[in-house]
Amino acid sequence: MVAFSALSGVSALSLLLCLVQHAHGVSLKVSTQGGNSSSPILYGFMFEDINHSGDGGIYGQLLQNPGLQGTTPNLTAWAAVGDATIAIDGDSPLTSAIPSTIKLDVADDATGAVGLTNEGYWGIPVDGSEFQSSFWIKGDYSGDITVRLVGNYTGTEYGSATITHTSTADNFTQASVKFPTTKAPDGNVLYELTVDGSVAAGSSLNFGYLTLFGETYKSRENGLKPQLANVLADMKGSFLRFPGGNNLEGNSAENRWKWNETIGDLWDRPGREGTWTYYNTDGLGLHEYFYWCEDLGLVPVLGVWDGFALESGGNTPITGDALTPYIDDVLNELEYILGDTSTTYGAWRAANGQEEPWNLTMVEIGNEDMLGGGCESYAERFTAFYDAIHAAYPDLILIASTSEADCLPESMPEGSWVDYHDYSTPDGLVGQFNYFDNLYRSVPYFIGEYSRWEIDWPNMKGSVSEAVFMIGFERNSDVVKMAAYAPLLQLVNSTQWTPDLIGYTQSPDDIFLSTSYYVQEMFSRNRGDTIKEVTSDSDFGPLYWVASSAGDSYYVKLANYGSETQDLTVSIPGTSTGKLTVLADNDPDAYNSDTQTLVTPSESTVQASNGTFTFSLPAWAVAVLAAN
């Protein structure tokens, strides 16, 4: 057992003294001997469905409200085509999970195309790849069914397919089509499904759980949008924490993220009211998260519900014997993930298409239990979940959802980790620079969420402050094992939290990378396995640094949190050449957004003289020197 207590960061006074230093030449000497080990999975991703980052974001399904899910189903995103009307039909369920379908009533004298359209999530990105659509239909009909992608305002057709299908009024039957597309100039595209009005005249047809997918990342069925997945792949992150976040907690025990309702066929997933103002289809479910990890080479970090909902919602926290069914539910989930096919839940996983167990090594118990009334009971709840999980799976790393000592057991179990979150102002993040210098080295840290807060878009001042914070924890990456910026993704048409790392609209190529994205990319792509000692003639502030090595390669990361240029000499014995990547702007408020890209990194080759590199770092800058 390991004792644990709270620690404080640097004082405001010391921060002020750092910030008022004048620019002058700074000399850094990197030792090529010794050093501390650095976590090989330091940089990664935290994901939850916020800002339509899942549905309408990285998840490849392009139709909004595809199954009319929810306790109060509606026709959001749907409209009728031709001489027909549509309505919600609760008397013709597709499955027990999808109790409502769309009823299409066709006029007695209808001719031409009649049917329904879907507007997607503020549009549909048509990228020129092969598309596929599926749907369930019930009703007496035998004839052509056409699926089209058509400009909302222009009427331009970007792809279509027609099939002949026969359905009856007795049962739903499924149909699917594949068709080539031409790239649309923007996201103003509608999905249109129509039947022959003259054949269907005077009748009613029901449609259930419709899907539309373009190309997916690595051609994964029910997979990710490649445009966004590629941007994440470019960062070379090491882990993915899922499914949240607040969206794991829900607003009550009943409303929590339920793993067993996110698996199997899409039409067997009821979805849930998410905690970020919109309904989640759960098409991006447990299997899809693990395939995301598999396809991007990420270590999965699974969050499990621990008896506490947001702001103590739904009479939570749950304690004592009342926790037992929720602990059992987590054990069932872990058997589903890790069990072989001789187990009940391992066999269920195999029946759902995944024969081999997944490689899960880390589980986080709850989310931010220090907030909203969760702290007082968390030590009890954490211990109950820890004891049960550890007994069944002793090799799993179990992570507490907070690092606040008042919320944790007096003695943390050997091998457990804690999770530290920090949303702050730029000065606040810089003020935490040496917080990690003072940690007890026996309790590993996961920095599960951090970023500069309360601004629309990441700007240079905020991104440099994040770099200072990152330099602080990378210097201590023997004990800080993982860290993730949050939130990760943002559909600009529906945003609940800013700033975010990556923004997008539904135009096919409309992805904009923030200044903070570039900082994350620069730091993640340039990693050593050993943190090196650096000696200097200057104190930290406004210039901050960390150095690491991997074999004969050295990486020096720098942040200039100030308005004056810094002249540097960086000595690394034995090196002769390097690549210098710099992200900088004299305007601390400069930012990238959906309307402008003002700041991008620049790269240059630099030569050393007797192992010493000489260069200047502009105001409000982040840089990485990769030398060998």
UniProtKB/Swiss-Prot annotation:
Principal subcellular localization: secreted
Enzyme class: hydrolase
GO molecular function, one term: alpha-L-arabinofuranosidase activity
Annotated disulfide bonds: none
Protein name stated in the entry: Probable alpha-L-arabinofuranosidase A
Function (record text): Alpha-L-arabinofuranosidase involved in the degradation of arabinoxylan, a major component of plant hemicellulose. Acts only on small linear 1,5-alpha-linked L-arabinofuranosyl oligosaccharides.
Signal peptide stretch: 1-25
UniProt keyword list: Carbohydrate metabolism, Glycoprotein, Glycosidase, Hydrolase, Polysaccharide degradation, Secreted, Signal
GO CC annotations, alphabetized: extracellular region
Catalysed transformations (reactions): Hydrolysis of terminal non-reducing alpha-L-arabinofuranoside residues in alpha-L-arabinosides
A biological process term (GO) from this entry: L-arabinose metabolic process
Entry-listed glycosylation sites: 36, 51, 74, 152, 171, 260, 359, 493
EC number of this enzyme: 3.2.1.55
Native organism: Aspergillus awamori (Black koji mold)
